[in-house]
Design a protein with these regions (language model features):
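C-terminal motif of bacterial Sec signal peptides marking the signal peptidase cleavage site
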Residues: 6-8
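Bacterial signal peptide processing site
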Residues: 10-12
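Extracytoplasmic substrate-binding proteins
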Residues: 15-20, 79, 85-146, 163-168, ...
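A short, structured surface patch at a secondary-structure boundary
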Residues: 20-88, 169
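Short secondary-structure boundary segments
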Residues: 25, 85, 143, 170, ...
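Alpha-helical, coiled-coil/dimerization segments enriched in small aliphatic residues
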Residues: 46-55, 59-60, 147-173
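Short acidic active-site motifs
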Residues: 69-72, 175-179
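A ligand-binding cleft/hinge motif common to bilobed small-molecule-binding domains
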Residues: 86-88, 189-205
Protein backbone atom coordinates (compact mmCIF):
# COMPACT_ATOMS: atom_id res chain seq x y z
CA UNK A 1 0.00 0.00 0.00
CA UNK A 2 1.40 3.36 -1.00
CA UNK A 3 1.78 6.12 1.55
CA UNK A 4 3.01 9.67 1.33
CA UNK A 5 6.81 9.89 0.84
CA UNK A 6 8.76 9.38 4.06
CA UNK A 7 11.17 11.90 5.49
CA UNK A 8 13.36 12.14 8.56
CA UNK A 9 11.70 12.34 11.95
CA UNK A 10 9.93 15.67 12.31
CA UNK A 11 10.87 16.89 8.83
CA UNK A 12 7.79 18.15 6.99
CA UNK A 13 7.15 17.40 3.37
CA UNK A 14 6.93 20.58 1.31
CA UNK A 15 3.79 21.24 -0.69
CA UNK A 16 1.67 18.74 1.17
CA UNK A 17 -1.71 18.20 -0.45
CA UNK A 18 -4.56 19.84 1.44
CA UNK A 19 -5.99 16.40 2.17
CA UNK A 20 -2.79 15.22 3.93
CA UNK A 21 -3.29 14.39 7.61
CA UNK A 22 -0.89 15.16 10.45
CA UNK A 23 -1.45 13.59 13.87
CA UNK A 24 0.10 15.58 16.71
CA UNK A 25 -0.76 13.26 19.64
CA UNK A 26 -0.86 9.58 20.52
CA UNK A 27 -4.62 9.93 21.01
CA UNK A 28 -5.06 11.18 17.47
CA UNK A 29 -2.85 8.37 16.15
CA UNK A 30 -5.16 5.75 17.61
CA UNK A 31 -8.30 7.27 16.21
CA UNK A 32 -6.83 7.80 12.75
CA UNK A 33 -5.67 4.18 12.54
CA UNK A 34 -9.28 3.07 13.05
CA UNK A 35 -10.51 4.97 9.98
CA UNK A 36 -10.77 3.02 6.72
CA UNK A 37 -8.79 4.14 3.70
CA UNK A 38 -6.81 6.79 5.57
CA UNK A 39 -3.24 5.44 5.37
CA UNK A 40 -2.36 7.01 2.03
CA UNK A 41 -3.17 10.45 3.45
CA UNK A 42 -1.03 10.22 6.59
CA UNK A 43 1.94 12.58 6.42
CA UNK A 44 3.11 12.46 10.06
CA UNK A 45 2.23 10.82 13.35
CA UNK A 46 2.86 11.74 16.97
CA UNK A 47 6.24 11.59 18.70
CA UNK A 48 4.95 8.48 20.54
CA UNK A 49 3.95 6.59 17.40
CA UNK A 50 6.86 4.14 17.78
CA UNK A 51 6.40 3.55 21.52
CA UNK A 52 5.01 0.53 23.31
CA UNK A 53 1.72 2.36 23.89
CA UNK A 54 1.18 2.98 20.18
CA UNK A 55 -1.18 1.03 17.96
CA UNK A 56 0.61 2.25 14.85
CA UNK A 57 1.20 -0.72 12.50
CA UNK A 58 4.80 -1.53 11.73
CA UNK A 59 4.66 -0.39 8.11
CA UNK A 60 3.68 3.13 9.22
CA UNK A 61 6.23 3.58 12.01
CA UNK A 62 8.75 5.16 9.66
CA UNK A 63 6.47 8.13 9.08
CA UNK A 64 7.82 11.48 10.35
CA UNK A 65 6.88 12.36 13.91
CA UNK A 66 5.65 15.64 15.33
CA UNK A 67 3.86 17.05 18.37
CA UNK A 68 1.83 20.03 19.58
CA UNK A 69 4.76 22.46 19.67
CA UNK A 70 3.53 25.58 17.89
CA UNK A 71 6.65 26.11 15.79
CA UNK A 72 6.76 22.50 14.63
CA UNK A 73 3.05 22.55 13.89
CA UNK A 74 3.54 25.56 11.63
CA UNK A 75 5.86 23.42 9.53
CA UNK A 76 2.92 21.13 8.81
CA UNK A 77 0.28 23.83 8.39
CA UNK A 78 -0.56 22.98 4.78
CA UNK A 79 -2.17 19.69 5.85
CA UNK A 80 -4.99 18.82 8.25
CA UNK A 81 -3.74 18.61 11.83
CA UNK A 82 -5.57 16.31 14.23
CA UNK A 83 -4.96 16.72 17.95
CA UNK A 84 -6.36 15.85 21.37
CA UNK A 85 -8.83 17.93 23.37
CA UNK A 86 -7.53 21.49 23.65
CA UNK A 87 -4.62 20.74 21.34
CA UNK A 88 -5.28 23.54 18.90
CA UNK A 89 -5.41 21.35 15.80
CA UNK A 90 -7.67 21.77 12.81
CA UNK A 91 -9.64 18.94 14.40
CA UNK A 92 -9.48 18.45 18.18
CA UNK A 93 -10.80 15.21 19.65
CA UNK A 94 -13.16 15.31 22.62
CA UNK A 95 -12.21 13.72 25.93
CA UNK A 96 -14.47 11.24 27.66
CA UNK A 97 -14.28 7.88 29.40
CA UNK A 98 -17.07 5.97 27.68
CA UNK A 99 -17.87 4.37 24.36
CA UNK A 100 -20.18 7.23 23.40
CA UNK A 101 -17.18 9.56 23.29
CA UNK A 102 -15.46 7.13 20.93
CA UNK A 103 -18.48 7.18 18.61
CA UNK A 104 -18.67 10.98 18.80
CA UNK A 105 -14.99 11.38 17.92
CA UNK A 106 -15.24 8.94 15.03
CA UNK A 107 -18.21 10.87 13.68
CA UNK A 108 -16.24 14.11 14.03
CA UNK A 109 -13.28 12.70 12.12
CA UNK A 110 -15.30 10.93 9.46
CA UNK A 111 -17.34 14.02 8.64
CA UNK A 112 -14.33 16.35 8.55
CA UNK A 113 -11.98 14.01 6.69
CA UNK A 114 -14.64 12.73 4.29
CA UNK A 115 -14.16 9.05 5.11
CA UNK A 116 -16.50 6.26 6.18
CA UNK A 117 -17.38 6.25 9.88
CA UNK A 118 -16.31 2.86 11.32
CA UNK A 119 -18.50 3.23 14.44
CA UNK A 120 -21.20 0.82 13.23
CA UNK A 121 -18.59 -1.88 12.59
CA UNK A 122 -17.01 -1.37 16.01
CA UNK A 123 -20.42 -1.35 17.70
CA UNK A 124 -21.23 -4.64 15.98
CA UNK A 125 -18.04 -6.13 17.39
CA UNK A 126 -19.11 -5.13 20.90
CA UNK A 127 -22.60 -6.45 20.29
CA UNK A 128 -21.25 -9.84 19.24
CA UNK A 129 -19.45 -10.47 22.53
CA UNK A 130 -20.76 -13.58 24.26
CA UNK A 131 -21.81 -12.89 27.87
CA UNK A 132 -20.37 -15.26 30.48
CA UNK A 133 -22.75 -17.58 32.31
CA UNK A 134 -22.05 -15.70 35.53
CA UNK A 135 -20.71 -12.16 35.59
CA UNK A 136 -17.38 -12.28 37.45
CA UNK A 137 -16.39 -9.64 39.99
CA UNK A 138 -13.36 -7.85 38.54
CA UNK A 139 -10.79 -5.65 40.26
CA UNK A 140 -8.63 -3.46 38.04
CA UNK A 141 -5.12 -2.71 39.31
CA UNK A 142 -2.24 -0.85 37.73
CA UNK A 143 1.39 -0.97 38.84
CA UNK A 144 0.87 1.63 41.56
CA UNK A 145 -2.14 -0.13 43.05
CA UNK A 146 -4.57 2.42 41.63
CA UNK A 147 -7.98 1.21 40.53
CA UNK A 148 -11.06 2.53 38.75
CA UNK A 149 -14.77 2.68 39.51
CA UNK A 150 -17.89 3.78 37.62
CA UNK A 151 -17.44 6.63 35.18
CA UNK A 152 -14.02 5.45 33.98
CA UNK A 153 -13.10 3.79 30.70
CA UNK A 154 -11.94 0.73 32.64
CA UNK A 155 -15.44 0.34 34.09
CA UNK A 156 -16.93 0.73 30.60
CA UNK A 157 -14.72 -2.08 29.28
CA UNK A 158 -15.46 -4.39 32.23
CA UNK A 159 -19.20 -3.97 31.70
CA UNK A 160 -18.96 -4.42 27.92
CA UNK A 161 -16.98 -7.64 28.42
CA UNK A 162 -19.65 -9.11 30.70
CA UNK A 163 -17.94 -8.50 34.02
CA UNK A 164 -18.94 -6.59 37.15
CA UNK A 165 -16.61 -4.00 38.62
CA UNK A 166 -15.97 -4.74 42.29
CA UNK A 167 -15.15 -1.05 42.85
CA UNK A 168 -18.39 0.88 43.41
CA UNK A 169 -16.95 4.31 44.20
CA UNK A 170 -16.91 6.46 41.08
CA UNK A 171 -13.71 7.59 39.40
CA UNK A 172 -10.01 6.81 39.63
CA UNK A 173 -8.69 6.08 43.11
CA UNK A 174 -5.85 4.59 45.14
CA UNK A 175 -7.27 2.60 48.06
CA UNK A 176 -4.88 1.74 50.87
CA UNK A 177 -3.17 -1.62 50.60
CA UNK A 178 -5.23 -3.20 53.39
CA UNK A 179 -8.45 -2.31 51.56
CA UNK A 180 -7.17 -3.87 48.35
CA UNK A 181 -6.10 -7.04 50.13
CA UNK A 182 -9.54 -7.28 51.76
CA UNK A 183 -11.43 -7.28 48.46
CA UNK A 184 -12.61 -10.62 47.09
CA UNK A 185 -12.70 -10.39 43.29
CA UNK A 186 -13.02 -13.35 40.98
CA UNK A 187 -10.53 -11.82 38.54
CA UNK A 188 -7.81 -9.19 38.77
CA UNK A 189 -7.55 -7.11 35.61
CA UNK A 190 -4.17 -5.47 35.19
CA UNK A 191 -2.17 -3.45 32.71
CA UNK A 192 1.40 -2.22 32.51
CA UNK A 193 2.62 -4.88 34.98
CA UNK A 194 4.88 -6.26 32.28
CA UNK A 195 6.41 -2.85 31.55
CA UNK A 196 10.16 -2.42 31.95
CA UNK A 197 9.59 0.81 33.88
CA UNK A 198 10.03 0.46 37.62
CA UNK A 199 8.76 3.18 39.94
CA UNK A 200 8.87 3.82 43.67
CA UNK A 201 5.06 3.66 43.82
CA UNK A 202 4.76 0.20 42.29
CA UNK A 203 2.76 -1.28 45.16
CA UNK A 204 1.56 -4.24 43.12
CA UNK A 205 5.16 -5.32 42.59
CA UNK A 206 6.76 -4.18 45.86
CA UNK A 207 4.19 -5.09 48.55
CA UNK A 208 4.57 -8.78 49.35
CA UNK A 209 1.06 -9.33 50.73
CA UNK A 210 -0.56 -7.57 47.78
CA UNK A 211 1.62 -9.50 45.36
CA UNK A 212 0.55 -12.75 47.05
CA UNK A 213 -3.08 -11.66 46.75
CA UNK A 214 -2.69 -11.02 43.04
CA UNK A 215 -1.03 -14.39 42.49
CA UNK A 216 -3.84 -16.22 44.33
CA UNK A 217 -6.56 -14.93 41.98
CA UNK A 218 -6.94 -15.45 38.22
CA UNK A 219 -5.30 -12.50 36.51
CA UNK A 220 -5.96 -11.03 33.09
CA UNK A 221 -3.38 -8.58 31.78
CA UNK A 222 -4.38 -6.29 28.93
CA UNK A 223 -1.78 -4.52 26.78
CA UNK A 224 -1.45 -0.89 27.83
CA UNK A 225 -1.89 0.28 24.24
CA UNK A 226 -5.57 -0.73 24.35
CA UNK A 227 -6.30 1.97 26.95
CA UNK A 228 -4.60 4.82 25.10
CA UNK A 229 -6.68 7.99 25.50
CA UNK A 230 -9.88 5.97 25.97
CA UNK A 231 -10.07 5.66 22.19
CA UNK A 232 -11.05 2.90 19.76
CA UNK A 233 -8.63 0.55 21.52
CA UNK A 234 -11.36 0.13 24.15
CA UNK A 235 -13.15 -2.18 21.71
CA UNK A 236 -10.01 -4.34 21.51
CA UNK A 237 -9.79 -4.26 25.31
CA UNK A 238 -13.40 -5.41 25.71
CA UNK A 239 -12.93 -8.24 23.19
CA UNK A 240 -9.68 -9.39 24.80
CA UNK A 241 -11.20 -9.30 28.30
CA UNK A 242 -14.38 -11.08 27.19
CA UNK A 243 -12.39 -13.89 25.54
CA UNK A 244 -10.19 -14.25 28.62
CA UNK A 245 -13.23 -14.41 30.94
CA UNK A 246 -14.83 -17.13 28.82
CA UNK A 247 -11.57 -19.10 28.80
CA UNK A 248 -11.35 -19.30 32.61
Amino acid sequence: MAVLPLFACGSPQTNLPKTAIISTTLCADGYLHSLPGIETRLAALSWQSRSGLSQTPQHLRALPQTDNDLERRLNWSSGIQVSSAGGGGDIDLKWGEDFQTVWDNLDLLASNLNVTDPAATLQARLGSLKPPTTSPLILYLDRSGATAGPGTFVDAVINAAGGTNIIKTAGWQSPDTETLIGLQPDIILSSFLDSNYVGVNDRTLRHAALEDKIRSIPQINLPGRYWTCAGPGLIDAAEHLNQAILAL
